[in-house]
C-alpha cells in the first residue's frame, strides 16, 4: 500500500527515528532531531556511501573541511552573486513563496507539466497572471513581483558586528574540496582522474522549506568532486550517474521509485554544462535525491582568479598543463534517509487477518542488525551472554518485555532484520531460533555461528 507523509512522520516520531527540533519550546520551524534509531539509520547510510565511494574506490580519497570559510571563497564560487531563489509574497496574508515551485505546483494541478526553475523573473510574473495562480495559504491572487533572494546565512566572526567581520555558513561542502584541491593532490600523490569526497553539514536560508526532512535549512551532504582531463568529462559523467543509481539499488531501493531526469538548458546552474538528477517518488511527488553535475573547470578557474593560486595540473604522460574538469555527484543525506524510510515502510495483511507494520530496510542500513529475545525472563542470563558477545561487532537490541509475538512486532516496526530467540532448549543444545523479518521464517542455529551469519547477511 502507498504510504502518506503523515504516516511516515508519525511512525518516525513514535519509534524514535526523528523528533521535531526544540519540541519542549514549541519547536523551530523545519528543524528535526534524529532520535536513537534515526541516527543509526543515517550513520549506516553515510557508512555505506563512504564504503563504496571512498574505501573501495581506486580513485577517491576523503576530506573534512571547515564549515566557516574565508568570505572570498563565496565571491569566487559565485554564491554571493548568484546563489538565489525566486521569491514572491502574497500581499493579502504576507505569506512568502518560492515562485518557481508555486507555479509548478499550480500548473501540475491543472494537468500542465512545466519546468519553471531558471526562467526569467518577468516570465514567472507572466505565468502567475496567465494561469490565475492563487496563494495556497489564503486564496488571494494579489502577489508582489518575483524577486531574487540570497540563500546564504550571514553571521559575524569575533566580537564586533561589522562588514569587515562578515562570514557565512557554507551553503555546500563542495567549495572546501575545491580550495584544497592542490593540498590533496600533492600530499596523496594523486594522478588524474581522482576524486575528493566529503560528508558534512550545509546551510541554506530556504524560502519555503517543508515536506519533513526533505527540504530544511540545515542539512547534511555527501559530495564527491571527481577531477578528470578536459574532454573526458562526459564519459565520467555517465559513469557516475550509473554508479550512483547502482548504489541505491544495491541497498534495496525499488527501481520503480527512481528516475533519472536530465536538466534542460535553461535549468542548468551557472557552472554546469550537463546535469542529471536522480529523483525519488516521494508521497508528495518526484523530488531530487542526487544531483550529478558536470561543473567543467569553473570552480578551479574562479579560485585561481580570486586567490592567485595555480591549479594547473601537469599531465606527466602527455606533458600537457591544464585545469582539470570536475564531475560532482551531490547527495542529500537527510533526503536519502527519508527515501529509504519511505521505500522500506509497509503494512502487510497477514493470513490470520491481522496487519503488521514492517520496515524492509536492507540489513546493512537497519539500526539494529538483530534483537536478542529470551523466551522467558528466567532465561535472561543465557540471552544476555549472547547479547554481550554480539554487541562487540554489531548494533543489537535486547528485549525481554511482553509476549514474544509483541516483541517480534516491535522489531518489525523498526526494521530489525533478525530476531534471535533464546528458549529453554537453548540451555540444553546451545542453539537459538533466528526469525527473518521479511519472510517470518524461523531456523535453528548454533550460538557460535551467529556472528558469521549476521556478517554474511549485512554485506552489500
From Swiss-Prot:
The gene is glyQS. It comes from the Bacteria. Homodimer. GO terms for cellular component: cytoplasm. Gene3D superfamilies: 3.30.40.230, Anticodon-binding domain, Bira Bifunctional Protein, Domain 2. Substrate binds at residues 98, 172, 219-223, 328-332. Its EC number is 6.1.1.14. The lineage of its organism: Bacteria, Bacillati, Bacillota, Bacilli, Bacillales. Keywords: Aminoacyl-tRNA synthetase, ATP-binding, Cytoplasm, Ligase, Nucleotide-binding, Protein biosynthesis. The keyword S-adenosyl-L-methionine does not apply. It catalyses: tRNA(Gly) + glycine + ATP = glycyl-tRNA(Gly) + AMP + diphosphate. Its main location: cytoplasm. Belongs to the class-II aminoacyl-tRNA synthetase family. InterPro entries: aa-tRNA-synt_IIb, aa-tRNA-synth_II, aa-tRNA-synth_II/BPL/LPL, Anticodon-bd, Anticodon-bd_dom_sf, Gly-tRNA_synthase/POLG2, Gly_tRNA_ligase_bac, GlyRS-like_core. SUPFAM superfamilies: Class II aaRS ABD-related (SSF52954), Class II aaRS and biotin synthetases (SSF55681). GO terms for biological process: glycyl-tRNA aminoacylation. One of its GO terms (molecular function) is glycine-tRNA ligase activity. This is Glycine--tRNA ligase.
Amino acid at each position: 500500500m502507498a504510504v502518506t507523509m503523515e504516516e511516515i512522520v508519525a511512525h518516525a516520531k513514535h519509534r524514535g527515528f526523528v523528533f521535531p527540533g526544540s519540541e519542549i519550546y514549541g519547536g523551530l520551524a523545519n528543524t528535526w532531531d534524529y532520535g536513537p534509531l534515526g541516527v543509526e539509520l543515517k550513520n549506516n547510510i553515510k557508512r555505506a556511501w563512504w564504503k563504496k565511494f571512498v574505501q573501495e574506490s581506486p580513485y577517491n580519497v576523503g576530506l573534512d573541511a571547515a564549515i566557516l570559510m574565508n568570505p572570498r571563497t563565496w565571491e569566487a564560487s559565485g554564491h554571493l552573486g548568484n546563489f538565489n531563489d525566486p521569491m514572491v509574497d502574497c500581499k493579502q496574508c504576507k505569506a512568502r513563496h518560492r515562485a518557481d515551485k508555486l507555479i509548478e505546483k499550480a500548473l501540475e494541478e491543472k494537468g500542465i507539466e512545466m519546468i519553471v526553475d531558471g526562467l526569467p523573473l518577468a516570465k514567472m510574473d507572466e505565468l502567475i497572471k496567465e494561469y490565475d495562480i492563487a496563494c495556497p495559504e489564503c486564496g488571494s491572487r494579489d502577489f508582489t513581483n518575483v524577486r531574487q533572494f540570497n540563500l546564504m546565512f550571514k553571521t559575524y566572526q569575533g566580537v564586533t558586528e561589522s562588514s569587515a567581520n562578515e562570514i557565512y555558513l557554507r551553503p555546500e561542502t563542495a567549495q572546501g574540496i575545491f580550495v584544497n584541491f592542490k593540498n590533496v593532490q600533492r600530499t596523496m600523490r594523486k594522478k588524474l582522474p581522482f576524486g575528493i569526497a566529503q560528508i558534512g553539514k550545509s546551510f541554506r536560508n530556504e524560502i519555503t522549506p517543508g515536506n519533513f526532512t526533505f527540504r530544511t535549512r540545515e542539512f547534511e551532504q555527501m559530495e564527491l568532486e571527481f577531477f578528470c582531463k578536459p574532454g573526458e568529462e562526459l564519459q565520467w559523467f555517465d559513469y557516475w550517474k550509473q554508479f550512483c543509481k547502482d548504489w541505491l539499488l544495491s541497498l534495496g531501493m525499488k527501481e520503480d521509485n527512481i528516475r533519472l531526469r536530465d536538466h534542460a538548458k535553461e535549468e542548468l546552474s551557472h557552472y554546469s554544462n550537463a546535469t542529471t538528477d536522480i529523483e525519488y517518488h516521494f508521497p508528495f511527488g518526484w523530488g531530487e535525491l542526487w544531483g550529478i553535475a558536470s561543473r567543467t573547470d569553473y570552480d578551479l578557474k574562479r579560485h585561481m582568479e580570486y586567490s592567485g593560486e595555480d591549479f594547473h595540473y601537469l599531465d606527466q604522460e602527455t606533458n600537457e598543463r591544464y585545469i582539470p574538469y570536475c564531475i560532482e555527484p551531490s547527495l542529500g543525506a537527510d533526503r536519502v534517509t527519508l527515501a529509504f524510510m519511505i521505500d522500506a515502510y509497509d503494512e502487510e495483511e497477514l493470513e490470520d487477518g491481522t496487519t503488521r507494520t514492517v520496515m524492509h530496510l536492507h540489513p546493512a542500513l537497519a539500526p539494529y542488525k538483530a534483537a536478542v529475545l529470551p523466551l522467558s525472563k528466567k532465561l535472561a542470563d543465557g540471552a544476555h551472554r549472547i547479547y554481550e558477545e554480539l554487541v562487540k561487532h554489531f548494533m543489537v537490541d535486547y528485549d525481554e518485555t511482553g509476549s514474544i509475538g509483541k516483541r517480534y512486532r516491535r522489531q518489525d516496526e523498526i526494521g530489525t532484520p533478525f530476531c534471535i530467540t533464546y528458549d529453554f532448549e537453548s540451555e540444553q543444545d546451545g542453539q537459538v531460533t533466528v526469525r527473518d523479518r521479511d519472510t517470518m521464517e524461523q531456523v535453528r542455529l548454533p550460538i557460535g555461528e551467529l556472528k558469521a551469519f549476521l556478517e554474511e547477511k549485512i554485506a552489500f
